[in-house]
Design a protein with these regions (language model features):
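Glycine- and small/polar-enriched repetitive beta-structure motifs of secreted/surface proteins
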Residues: 1-167
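Intramolecular chaperone/auto-protease modules of tailspike-like proteins
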Residues: 166-308
Length: 308
């Protein structure tokens, strides 16, 4: 072991192959048997509460400071992965992945994934990704989600088309789509300007402390002070967009029998915190194809009548 700093690795008697650099780093690590812990902590109080967790890397002041028995985690940045009991989580950025009991989460960017608690297999990239106001909304217990950026992202660019998995061998319960021309005729295409509610929320990060002056990890979910500003149009964008209202499409979905409890509908979706609706525009393609086919059938029938 290598220890440099006040109380660094001060209670470990049997663990080995750990490195602690800084005040109170890995100060409570204590293995009762001969164990290769392979923990690395660099920065003020980084990993200070790790007891039996192994293969962890914490770099930054208070990085992983309330992590106990989690393993194979990586945290880089002040307060990153601060209170963690999960495994294989990666957090890079100030306050990223603050309190996590889930596993296999990845967060890159300041406060990315900050509100994820028990969720697993999530990916949050960019400032405030998967946090209140972001396109993915605040994710807490949800799993298998990807969030890119916050509410200020205005465009996304990639050199080639996305390839979406669609192998028939991975699908079952095939039925012919019954949404076609009638559904398309009922849609209401619109132009609009964005005036996002999230822009009227003043997100001021505050850190709460317990009676002893330590960071209150149990109250982390309230460490964001949200001050709502009047929604008066001052943040309205000056450029036009085109599309549909998600609520209108959901109404059509329900009428067609595609509303399944509170789960994601065929075309509409709801963020994990239930605060923002979205549309999966790529799924309109099969419906448009069906509508064209139905229309072509009608055209051919009329043509046949005219020619005979």
């Amino acid at each position: 072991n290598v220890a440099l700093g006040v109380s660094a690795l001060s209670t470990d008697t049997a663990g080995s192959r750990s490195t602690a650099l800084g005040y109170f780093t890995l100060t409570t690590q204590n293995f009762t048997g001969a164990t290769d812990s392979y923990n690395t902590a660099v920065g003020f109080a980084a990993g200070q509460l790790v007891t039996t967790g192994t293969n962890n890397t914490f770099v930054g002041g208070l990085a992983g400071d309330a992590t106990d028995d989690g393993g194979s985690n990586t945290a880089v940045g002040y307060l990153s992965l601060s209170a963690n009991a999960g495994d294989q989580n990666t957090a890079v950025g100030d306050s990223s992945l603050g309190v996590v009991t889930g596993d296999n989460n990845t967060a890159i960017g300041r406060a990315a994934g900050l509100q994820i608690t028990s969720g697993s297999n999530n990916i949050a990239i960019g400032l405030d990704a998967l946090r209140t106001g972001s396109p993915g909304g605040a994710q807490t217990s949800a799993s298998n989600k990807i969030g890119l950026g916050d509410e200020n992202i205005s465009s996304a660019n990639i050199q080639v088309d996305w390839t979406v998995a669609s192998d028939a061998r991975d699908k079952t319960d095939f039925t012919a789509l019954d949404l076609g021309l009638d559904f398309v005729k009922a849609l209401s295409p619109i132009t609009y300007k964005w005036d996002k509610r999230a822009k009227y929320i003043d997100k001021t990060d505050v850190t709460t402390y317990d009676d002893d002056g330590n960071i209150d990890h149990e109250g982390w979910d309230i460490t964001t002070d949200l001050n709502t500003i009047t929604h008066d149009g001052t943040h309205k964008e000056d450029w036009l967009d085109v599309g549909f209202k998600a609520q209108d499409v959901e109404t059509l979905e329900k009428a067609a029998g595609y509303k399944i409890a509170d789960k994601t509908n065929l075309l509409t979706s709801l963020t994990g915190d239930g605060k923002q609706m979205g549309l999966q525009y790529s799924k309109f393609v099969p419906i448009l194809v069906k509508a064209i086919q139905e229309q072509q059938t009608a055209i051919e029938a009329l043509t046949a009548r005219i020619t005979t």
